[in-house]
Structures are given as structure tokens and as C-alpha cells.
């Protein structure tokens, strides 16, 4: 199998997802990162849509990219307008992008009801736009919007549109499942029909409205597509686009002979995924295949026992292949194998009786509502206590939190903490923005002189668990545990 091109449209299609916006610097940073990993194309945006995208193309031209070609995205000319007079066409040329991706209508429904032109004019719009841009020395890719819906409704016309693009000079025809509603079998049928109709290479662009974007993309490759368009982490409008992280991992690791990315690019997929989540100011998706924090996390005792003996018994690939790592979780569902795996870093005797006592302690705590899966430090403290090796750094005498209103009727939270630190007793009061912040400030005041490194530690997140949902209140000890867990 020849090289499969990866065309990333995170900066254009991905930014159309709800709540997602990339700054100009974000766009340039991601372009550099994608180039480092060996992506073939980076679609930077639509130059006519906003000043930020227009400036991006001016700035990106100065980047010393080694692998990726930067593409500008645009639409066909307007009806009854020559391409050289069309503002969109002129903006694409002004972007100075060497590659231009033009999207055009393939579904006769859109031609009649959205563009409100006849079929002949739509074919002319496609041919004129691609032909004029091609004559200006640009590489042209044609996105056949709604191709699979169009092929289902009117196969002859759908195929005529991509033939018009080929005749005008498109290097590649990209077949789009724009509504994300087609099944893999329909994708295969459409790709095979397109291969019979045109001789230029085909690409695939799938949306995820049926949770099939990755599967449909891989099915298209199997049917002969040589480019996959998508976004990192599947970002995009509605339900998103094909996740290029999963696409790349599957192509590299599951389909023999596929050539993708640069040397060691696949091993950086986890890094790339999390980098994009950070740029988009989004939380990582724990269950994301290949790169999620839970992708290689094992909780059931039988599973952990088997993984400790032979990792591939419960893992389809080595986590390090994609830059991820194996995690052993501890919970009330755990067996002794989980406990043994999680306590190897401690200098304790790993006898059966101690492992059982630790497991019993975990079960008792979780029965009260605590969780240790994302609380590594809390579990470590529990192990040391059960093993008789815990040396407390301080002792809590008592604490109190008051929530009142000030003279302007604004909430005012005050925490009082009394601790025994060595031979001294620290009794302090602090105000904060809510109970957790007030307790954080009070504890810092009490402990900072003994433990100066606390000044380098920040409380970045916390959780409050409602222990008895029918009563609708949070248990105070669970509340405090959530705070101390986040701090450690």
C-alpha cells in the first residue's frame, strides 16, 4: 500500500466546534507541531472569513516547514461571476498559499434549494473556479461536499461534479460525508464508483454524526482513498470530524504497508492530542482510544493479574507505541494483583496478609464515598498507614468554615484551622473565595513556615461528592478529602 496522506483541518473545521476558538499564535504553534510529526497538509483556514485567518497565511509563509503543505480553504465562485472578479477567489490567491482546497456542491438538492442554480451552472462554477486557480500555479484539491448523500440521490450528477473538477485541474478529489450519516458499506460503494469515474487520487472527509467517522475513513482507505481529512481529537461542528489521532494510529499499527507521518511521529500522538486539548482549553477525554488516560487503564482484578503476566492479554497494542502509558487502578473492584502492582514503589513486605488489609481499607473508604482512581497521593497515604509506616507531618486539632455575607450582601467565607506542627500549635484564620479556597489559604498560613515548598504548590482543581444524593448534601469528610487529595 502506498503512502496515505493525512490532511489536518483542525484549524478550520475543528474550530467550528462549539466553544472552540484558536488564537493566531495557537494556529501557528499547531502548524509547527503537525509539521514536526509529519502531517502532509495543514488547512489553515478560510482567508475571506476573518482577519485572523488572513494574517495567519501571511505569517505561516515564514515558517520553515519540512513536511506539511499549508492549504487555504474556499468555495467555488458565485453564480454569474467570473472567478477573477470573485472576492473569494481573489482572497485565496492573496493568501499566497501554494495549495488551495475548493469545496463545491455535489448533491442536487443543495444545487436546487441552497445555491438555487441549475445543474449546468453548478458544474461551470466548479470547473471555472478550479481552472482559474490552477492557471495561477496553485495545487488544487477539490472537496466534493455531500458526495455520498448526492451519490445516493442522483449518482450520475454526483459523478459529473467530480469529473468537472478533474478536467479543470484538481490534483485530488476528496469525497465528503458532510452530514456524517452514511455507513461504511455506503462509503465503500461511493469510493469505488468515484474510482471508476475519475483517474486522479481520491481522499475522504467524514463527519461523526453516527459515531462512524473513523470507521468510514478506514473503509474508504480500504476501497482506494489515498488521503484522509480530519481533525485532532475529532474536534468539529455538531458531533465532530474523523479523529486523525485514531485514524493515524489505526493506519500505522493495524493496516500492513501503510506509510504515514514522519519517523517516530506515531509515538507522539498522545503528546499531540493533549497539546490540542490544551490549546482549545478543553479537558482531556479519558476514554479516547489510543491516547486517553483510560485507554490502557486496568481496574478489574482478573485483568490486572493477566496484564502483569502478559500485557497483550488485555491490551491490543503496547501503550508506548503511541506515547501513552499503562495504568493500574485501585478501587473496591480491585484484587490483590492491583494492590501489588501499585505498591511496588514502597519498601514494604508484599505478603498476602498486608495486601488483603490494604484492599479491605480501600473497600471501606470507597463504601463511604471516596475514590482512589485519580487520587494517587491519597492511596499512597493509605498504604503507608496500613503498613504502619506513615509519619504524619502535622496533626489536625480542629477546623471550622463560616459562610456569611458582608455589608454589600456579597458572600464572605472564613476558615479557621488549628494544627499541631511538630512541637508548635498553629491557630490561623483566612478568608477565601468559597470554602475550599478559604481552607487552602488557612492551611498554607499554618504550614508554610515548616514547609516552605508549599509556596510552589497550587490547588488547581477539586471535587465535591454528594455522598447521599437523596438527602442532597455533601459529607464534610468527603469534602475535605477532595481538597487534600487535589493539594497533594
Q: What are these model-predicted stretches?
A:
Residues 66-73:
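A glycine-rich helix N-cap at a beta->alpha junction
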Residues 450-487:
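Generic long, charged, amphipathic alpha-helical segments
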Amino acid at each position: 500500500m502506498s503512502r496515505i496522506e493525512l490532511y489536518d483541518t483542525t484549524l478550520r473545521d475543528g474550530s467550528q466546534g462549539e466553544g472552540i476558538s484558536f488564537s493566531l499564535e495557537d494556529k501557528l504553534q499547531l502548524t509547527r507541531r503537525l509539521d514536526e510529526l509529519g502531517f502532509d497538509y495543514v488547512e489553515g483556514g478560510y482567508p475571506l472569513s476573518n482577519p485572523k485567518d488572513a494574517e495567519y497565511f501571511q505569517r505561516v509563509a515564514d515558517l520553515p516547514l519540512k513536511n506539511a503543505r499549508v492549504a487555504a480553504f474556499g468555495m467555488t465562485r458565485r453564480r454569474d461571476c467570473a472567478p477573477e472578479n470573485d472576492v473569494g477567489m481573489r482572497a485565496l490567491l492573496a493568501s499566497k498559499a501554494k495549495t488551495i482546497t475548493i469545496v463545491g456542491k455535489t448533491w442536487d438538492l443543495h444545487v436546487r434549494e441552497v445555491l438555487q442554480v441549475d445543474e449546468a451552472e453548478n458544474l461551470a462554477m466548479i470547473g471555472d473556479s478550479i481552472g482559474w486557480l490552477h492557471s495561477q500555479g496553485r495545487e488544487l484539491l477539490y472537496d466534493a461536499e455531500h458526495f455520498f448523500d448526492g451519490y445516493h440521490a442522483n449518482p450520475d450528477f454526483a459523478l459529473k461534479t467530480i469529473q468537472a473538477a478533474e478536467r479543470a485541474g484538481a490534483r485530488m478529489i476528496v469525497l465528503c460525508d458532510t452530514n456524517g450519516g452514511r455507513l461504511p458499506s455506503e462509503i465503500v460503494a461511493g469510493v469505488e464508483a468515484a474510482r471508476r469515474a475519475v483517474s486522479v487520487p481520491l481522499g475522504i472527509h467524514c463527519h461523526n454524526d453516527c459515531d462512524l467517522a473513523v470507521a468510514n475513513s478506514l473503509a474508504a482507505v480500504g476501497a482506494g482513498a489515498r488521503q484522509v481529512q480530519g481533525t485532532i481529537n475529532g474536534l468539529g461542528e455538531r458531533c465532530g470530524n474523523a479523529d486523525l489521532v485514531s485514524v493515524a494510529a489505526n493506519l500505522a499499527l493495524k493496516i500492513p504497508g501503510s506509510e504515514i507521518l514522519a519517523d517516530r511521529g506515531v509515538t507522539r500522538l498522545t503528546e499531540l492530542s493533549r497539546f490540542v486539548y490544551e490549546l482549545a482549553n478543553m479537558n482531556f477525554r479519558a476514554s479516547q482510544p489510543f491516547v486517553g488516560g483510560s485507554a490502557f487503564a486496568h481496574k478489574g482484578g482478573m485483568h490486572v493479574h493477566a496484564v502483569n503476566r502478559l500485557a497483550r492479554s488485555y491490551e491490543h497494542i503496547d501503550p508506548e507505541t503511541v506515547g501513552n502509558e499503562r495504568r493500574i487502578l485501585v478501587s473496591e473492584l480491585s484484587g490483590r494483583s492491583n494492590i501489588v502492582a501499585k505498591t511496588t514503589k514502597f519498601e514494604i513486605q508484599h505478603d498476602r496478609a498486608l495486601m488483603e488489609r490494604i484492599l479491605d481499607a480501600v473497600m471501606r473508604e470507597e463504601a463511604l464515598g471516596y475514590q482512589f482512581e485519580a487520587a494517587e497521593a491519597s492511596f499512597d497515604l493509605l498504604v503507608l498507614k496500613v503498613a504502619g509506616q506513615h509519619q504524619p507531618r502535622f496533626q489536625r486539632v480542629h477546623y471550622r468554615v463560616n459562610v456569611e455575607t458582608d455589608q454589600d450582601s456579597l458572600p464572605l467565607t472564613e476558615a479557621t484551622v488549628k494544627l499541631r506542627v511538630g512541637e508548635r500549635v498553629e491557630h490561623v484564620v483566612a478568608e477565601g473565595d468559597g470554602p475550599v479556597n478559604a481552607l487552602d489559604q488557612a492551611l498554607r498560613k499554618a504550614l508554610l513556615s515548616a514547609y516552605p515548598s508549599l509556596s510552589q504548590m497550587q490547588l488547581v482543581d477539586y471535587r465535591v461528592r454528594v455522598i447521599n444524593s437523596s438527602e442532597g448534601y455533601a459529607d464534610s469528610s468527603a469534602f475535605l478529602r477532595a481538597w487534600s487529595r487535589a493539594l497533594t
